[in-house]
């Protein structure tokens, strides 16, 4: 037993980490032989992976930088757009329409609205935005209509009302209110003339006893606020100054008064001495530079001092010197007023800056008047007597109800009883430049209106309203505008955007038949 125990030998336990079996040595040697190649391959793969990671990282950085640049570009574009919108003001759509109308080669005028009235419509007036329409007639009532729903067709004419008109006339007027043309409890008087505030705050009305009544139309509608008393006969025409603080009135007493609406006093008096006043029209403000001075207005109308030897002056030398001295004194007064110190700088800046409309309205000093006997006068607020006087030409009957200026303010068109429209140029003497003849059976010309392009003239005769082309040289030079037929036209009006035209039929207290209808037309330019 001892021998067996002595002979027995025990091997120590070996862990795999401590040693390998002999047969594993060869495998280990083989593995060692293979490992260098695998290590090289692994190193290459690791290098490739690192390179790919570096490339992807670079691409990510590039993408981030590109995104940042795009964001910066967008921000700069937005800021530049904001600056452009802030620097460049938005275009006024009304100015676009005016520009389009002034350059139009043709106007297509189609009647769409009719307001029948059982009285002679002597006058009508609009607010500046065409929101409200005021009409006055022989029955002694002033009516107020809502224009936009009317022209949009919210109320249609009945079958009986549509019968006298063409097929395009389907819309009727929407009446808002009406009131009597009277003051201090007097009997209602026929409305001979109307003038409305641009925003509809008040309306002026001419009465048969010579008064001019001012009605409130926005607050206490139809309330007679005051009455201007100076005329002794019916006030046949009213013309608001551009500032809407003054008004010209003409009457059957052959007098024209210039009123201050703030005080109710007559500033100036103009005696026509020839006949009942039938029309008063201010010279267009576009005829002069709207940013110029009063002397520019005079020079554009009557020539320049530098060319006094070459042009036909309408004033003599003494009058020209007086006007120059007056304009110099006015300019000196303006300079003294601007030199006066003020309380704050902001108020001085606001006082000195004027809008184009305000500055141009302050310069509308020249106007024309026509008398029922056919005589026409051109006046200036800075002079007592008329600047120009156009007598009735030989062979022409003594009758004139309307006259108008051309858009540039250099020509005057006046309608005659014998169906002729005479054209005068204020720089070329007192004889008509040419005569536009209507058909023999057309009747007297009761109203004329010049279109914004200066090429077309709207002429209303007893039979029809015509659109006359002043540049036509052969053939018939006019087109008949459908709608009106068989009556005198008391008033014609084209809105500032040249999208609508309006006509009213009335005799204004003189002899003549009427259709007793107010018509509205839509104008399409081309």
UniProtKB/Swiss-Prot annotation:
Gene Ontology CC, one term: chromatin
Coiled coil: none
Cell compartment(s), UniProt: Cytoplasm; Nucleus
Region annotated Disordered, chain positions: 1-98, 327-364
Ranges of biased composition (kind: Polar residues): 341-364
Major location (coarse): cytoplasm
GO aspect biological process, one term: regulation of transcription by RNA polymerase II
Gene3D superfamilies: YVTN repeat-like/Quinoprotein amine dehydrogenase (2.130.10.10)
First and last residues of every WD repeat: 116-155, 186-225, 230-271, 348-389, 395-434, 440-478
Bias type Acidic residues, positions: 21-30, 44-78
Gene Ontology molecular function: any one: transcription coactivator activity
InterPro entries reported for this sequence: WD40/YVTN_repeat-like_dom_sf, WD40_repeat_dom_sf, WD40_rpt
Entry keywords, A to Z: Cytoplasm, Nucleus, Phosphoprotein, Repeat, Transcription, Transcription regulation, WD repeat
Composition skew (Basic and acidic residues), residue ranges: 31-43, 79-98
Subunit structure as annotated in this protein's UniProt entry: Component of the 1.8 MDa SAGA (Spt-Ada-Gcn5 acetyltransferase) complex, which is composed of 19 subunits tra1, spt7, taf5, ngg1/ada3, sgf73, spt20, spt8, taf12, taf6, hfi1/ada1, ubp8, gcn5, ada2, spt3, sgf29, taf10, taf9, sgf11 and sus1.
Protein family according to the UniProt entry: Belongs to the WD repeat SPT8 family.
Protein's job: Component of the transcription coactivator SAGA complex. SAGA acts as a general cofactor required for essentially all RNA polymerase II transcription. At the promoters, SAGA is required for transcription pre-initiation complex (PIC) recruitment. It influences RNA polymerase II transcriptional activity through different activities such as TBP interaction (via core/TAF module) and promoter selectivity, interaction with transcription activators (via Tra1/SPT module), and chromatin modification through histone acetylation (via HAT module) and deubiquitination (via DUB module).
Name of the protein in its database record: SAGA complex subunit Spt8
UniProt organism field: Schizosaccharomyces pombe (strain 972 / ATCC 24843)
């Amino acid at each position: 037993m001892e021998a067996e125990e002595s002979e027995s030998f025990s091997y120590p336990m070996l862990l795999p980490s401590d040693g390998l079996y002999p047969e594993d040595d060869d495998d280990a040697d083989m593995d060692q032989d293979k490992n260098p190649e695998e290590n090289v391959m692994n190193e290459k793969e690791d290098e490739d992976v690192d390179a790919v990671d570096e490339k992807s990282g670079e691409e990510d950085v590039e993408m981030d930088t590109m995104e940042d640049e795009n964001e910066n570009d967008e921000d700069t574009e937005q800021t530049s757009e904001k600056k452009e919108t802030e620097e460049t003001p938005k275009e006024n759509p009304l100015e676009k329409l005016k520009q389009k109308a002034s350059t139009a080669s043709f106007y297509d005028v189609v009647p769409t609205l009719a307001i029948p009235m059982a009285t002679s419509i002597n006058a009508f007036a609009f607010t500046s935005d065409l929101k409200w329409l005021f009409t006055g007639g022989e029955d002694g009532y002033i009516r107020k209509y809502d224009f936009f729903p009317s022209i949009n067709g919210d109320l249609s004419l009945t079958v009986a009302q549509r019968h006298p008109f063409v097929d395009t006339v389907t819309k009727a007027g929407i009446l808002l209110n009406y009131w009597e043309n009277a003051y201090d409890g007097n009997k209602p008087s026929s409305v001979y003339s109307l003038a409305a505030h641009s925003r509809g705050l008040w309306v002026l009305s001419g009465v048969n006893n010579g008064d001019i009544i001012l009605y409130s139309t926005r607050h206490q509608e139809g309330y007679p606020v005051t009455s201007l008393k100076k005329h002794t006969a019916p006030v046949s025409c009213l013309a608001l100054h551009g500032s809407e603080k003054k008004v010209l009135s003409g009457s059957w007493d052959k007098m024209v008064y210039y009123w201050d609406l703030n005080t109710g006093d007559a500033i100036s008096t103009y005696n026509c001495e020839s006949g009942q006043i039938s029309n008063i029209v201010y010279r267009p403000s576009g005829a002069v530079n709207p940013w110029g001075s009063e002397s520019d207005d005079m020079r554009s109308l009557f020539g320049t001092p530098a060319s006094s030897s070459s042009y036909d002056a309408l004033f003599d030398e003494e009058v020209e010197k007086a006007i120059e001295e007056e304009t110099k004194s006015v300019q000196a007064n303006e300079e003294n007023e601007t030199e006066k110190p003020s309380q704050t700088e902001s108020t001085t800046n606001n006082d000195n800056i004027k809008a184009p409309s305000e500055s141009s309205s302050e310069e509308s000093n020249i106007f024309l008047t026509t008398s029922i006997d056919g005589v026409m006068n051109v006046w200036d607020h800075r002079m007592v007597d008329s600047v120009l006087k156009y007598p009735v030409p030989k062979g022409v009957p003594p009758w004139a109800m309307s006259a108008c200026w051309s858009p540039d303010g250099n020509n005057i068109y006046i309608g005659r009883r014998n169906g002729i429209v005479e054209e005068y140029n204020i720089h070329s003497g007192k004889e008509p430049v040419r005569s536009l003849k209507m058909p023999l059976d057309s009747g007297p010309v009761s109203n004329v209106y010049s279109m914004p392009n200066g090429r077309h003239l709207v002429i209303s005769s007893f039979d029809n309203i015509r659109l006359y082309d002043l540049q036509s040289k052969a053939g018939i030079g006019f087109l008949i505008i459908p709608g009106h037929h068989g009556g005198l036209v008391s008033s014609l009006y084209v809105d500032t955007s040249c999208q609508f035209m309006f006509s009213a039929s009335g005799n204004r207290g003189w002899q003549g038949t009427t259709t007793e209808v107010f018509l509205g037309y839509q104008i399409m330019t081309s």
